Regions:
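Conserved acidic residues
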Residues: 33, 111-114
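Short secondary-structure capping/turn micro-motifs that flank functional sites
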Residues: 43-44, 109-111, 149-150
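Hydrophobic targeting/anchoring helices
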Residues: 1-100, 209, 232-234, 240-243
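A conserved amphipathic helix/loop scaffold
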Residues: 91, 101, 105-107, 117-336
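Hydrophobic, well-ordered secondary-structure elements that form the walls
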Residues: 27, 76, 114, 283, ...
Length: 336
């Protein structure tokens, strides 16, 4: 089963009307079949919220112009069993890093990319389900919290353990040779506290890391298993600190999720990406300033059409440059 509706309210949004409208956009972009404005009495009768009804009405008029063209949302399958608990908001934080996810309460055995946060470890059959996916060529992405909760059961896949030690980090590196070595030094927005994941060199590949003193700590690890692979993302103790990973590290993380997607975002956190099976995408910035970003698009895409502004944007070298404005949606049709 799944929830096919959505609702939002105006409370605590008077400081910025955009914060109210964003709730509406997110509900509609997820293609909820029913939208409830809560509470209608407040919106109509309470002078505090007198501006909310006209602006949300204008929003509905705007979205009516293109919502029917978008098709169905697509994203990496994010499995969380009905009674699973742990890292409860991680999907929201990853979404704010520009990673489209499609939530599932049943294990998505037919999907090629599967995301498992800590709550997925509450499925007593999760190890056998993961094995089947990877033996059939699938990519499974897990969090450090999933590794911690699964405990010794995770050793079935790779020799990685969640240690009791922490590290405060602010400088990072990525790998340009699929994990053979790391290179570069990229400074995060601010220091981030992460768990130290223990792993054996040459048993697993480090795709992104954080620098310590004469050492480094893994941020993204990957290992082959059967015809597939498993990747591990280190989640900061404060999940919101994912936003403070530098662009280069975020690009590594997005790449894990994006191999089945029509486009992958390259840019800072705070930029959302919505993907659809029709070949449309929406890019929306929640940053408080303008920002230039890039979409890495699927092979064969030669241009994008902004269907709101009726502007064509050429693709060069598989990349589409975009100028984002706070709270403004770029609704794009990717054209081959």
């Amino acid at each position: 089963g799944r929830n096919l509706g959505g609702w939002f309210d105006p409370y605590e949004c008077t400081y910025n009307l955009t914060s109210y409208l964003e709730q509406a956009y997110l509900t509609l972009f997820a293609k909820a079949r029913e939208v409830a404005l809560f509470s209608l009495g407040s919106i109509i009768d309470d002078p505090t919220f007198r501006l909310f009804a006209p602006v949300v009405g204008e929003l509905f008029d705007e979205v009516d112009g293109y919502l029917g063209q978008l098709g169905n949302p697509v994203g990496a399958a994010a499995y969380r069993p009905a009674n699973g608990r742990g890292e409860d908001n991680i999907h929201n934080y990853l979404g704010m890093c520009g990673i489209p996810l499609e939530p599932c309460i049943d294990y998505p055995e037919k999907e090629k990319v599967i995301f498992l946060a800590e709550g997925a470890a509450d499925d007593p059959m999760i190890v056998s389900k993961m094995k089947k996916s990877m033996l059939e060529g699938g990519s499974v992405i897990v969090t450090s919290g999933f590794v911690r909760k699964l405990g010794d059961g995770f050793s079935e896949f790779v020799n990685v353990k969640y240690s009791a030690r922490k590290a405060m980090v602010s400088e990072f590196a990525d790998s340009k040779n699929s994990g053979v070595s790391i290179s570069g030094k990229y400074t995060g927005v601010k220091p981030v506290l992460i768990p130290q994941m223990e792993y054996c060199t040459n048993d697993v590949w480090e795709l992104a890391a954080a620098y310590g003193t004469d050492n480094n700590f893994p941020v993204v690890l990957r290992c082959s298993y059967g015809d597939g692979n498993i990747s591990i993302i280190t989640i900061p103790d404060d999940m919101g600190d994912l936003y403070h990973y530098p662009v280069q590290v975020l690009s590594v993380i997005r790449g894990l999720f994006g191999k089945e997607m029509p486009a992958v975002l390259e840019g800072p956190a705070g930029i959302q990406l919505f993907s659809y099976d029709s070949g449309h995408v929406i890019v929306r910035s929640d940053l408080p300033y303008m920002e230039d970003v890039t979409l890495k698009v699927a092979d064969g895409v030669r241009m994008a059409k902004d269907i709101v502004r009726n502007v064509e944007i050429p693709v060069t070298g598989g990349r589409l440059p975009l100028h984002t404005v706070p709270g403004v949606n770029c609704v794009l049709e990717l054209i081959k």
